Amino acid sequence: MNEQSITISVVTPTYNRLARLQRVLAALAAQTYSPDRFEVVIVSDGSTDGTADYCQQVQMPFRLNFIQQANAGPAAARNRGVAAARGALVLFLDDDVVPAPNLIAEHLRLHEERANRVVLGTMLTPPDACLSPWVAWEQAMLEKQYRAMTSGVWPATARQFYTGNTSLARQLVMAAGGFDERFRRAEDIELAYRLNKLGVEFIFAPQAAGYHYAERSFASWLVTPYIYGRNDIIFGREQQIDLIGFVRREFGQRNRLTRWLVWVLLDRGRSSATALAVMSQLALLMHRVLGEQSSRPIYSAIFNLRYYQGVADELGGRDRFFGPETTITATQA
């Protein structure tokens, strides 16, 4: 294969998800875009499940570059993949996101229309997926964002830069300094803020579809919003962005249940833990008896409570989070 013919590099970090990775690779082999024109860079982040043996032996119609590293997190793995990429464009695709046949072609079409773009594809719920209730909630919230962007309720921004399915010029990643390897979660959003300062255009691409075979434990799901909350404050502080102002305004727009729960339970460790345990069991019961949609408001409340606790902890406590206007809004809920 002539390396000069490669126009786009698919970069996929992976960690002990061989079965899912095999499905992703099979879908990449079935792309409508010529396999001579793209490569796939797999970065194993310390996998111990046979990923290395499989990737080193499998034959694919495209160039497959396999890289093994000690476990260092997804940011480090993506940086390693970008460094090895030969294409002028980089497409980040997670190891549990199965691409539709035209995914690569659709990303490329939008880049050909205009340079300096970040193309944001979708991570849709697969019709054959059996998701945990909290993961089903997460997917529902993601697809709610997609509908909002499609209908013009809001434009695509740095906050929708999810590296499960997104593409941009390799030189833009390098110019922004790559992923910050200190962060194990939301490292994609942090990079997006730096990309935004370079004047890139974020564009939503609903036709660049991927199917997200998501799986995570409830304990992992519960930790995620807390880290997001802390990271939002860290990102704002380090990049001199008024994210706390954004977070407070967003809080004021939350529903009454969420605002009341946060007002009552923020920084109340024992009470908060009890409430989370009760809400978790109630959500499972409602999901089982009444169906997935009935549990969504409860999972939203759990997620938001954990997120705002992360915000408050990074700020130094609830008093630092609740400004006068926020206090009034919460007590009126």
Question: What is each of the regions a protein language model found here?
Answer:
Residues 1-30:
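N-proximal low-complexity "stem/linker" segments adjacent to membrane-targeting elements
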Residues 27, 35, 44-53, 71, ...:
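A conserved acidic beta->alpha catalytic loop
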Residues 102-135, 213:
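Conserved donor NDP-sugar-binding/catalytic core segment of glycosyltransferases
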Residues 122-123, 138-158:
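Short, flexible, basic/aromatic active-site loop/helix in glycosyltransferases
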Residues 148-171, 184, 190:
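A recurrent flexible, glycine/aromatic-enriched loop bordering the glycosyltransferase active site
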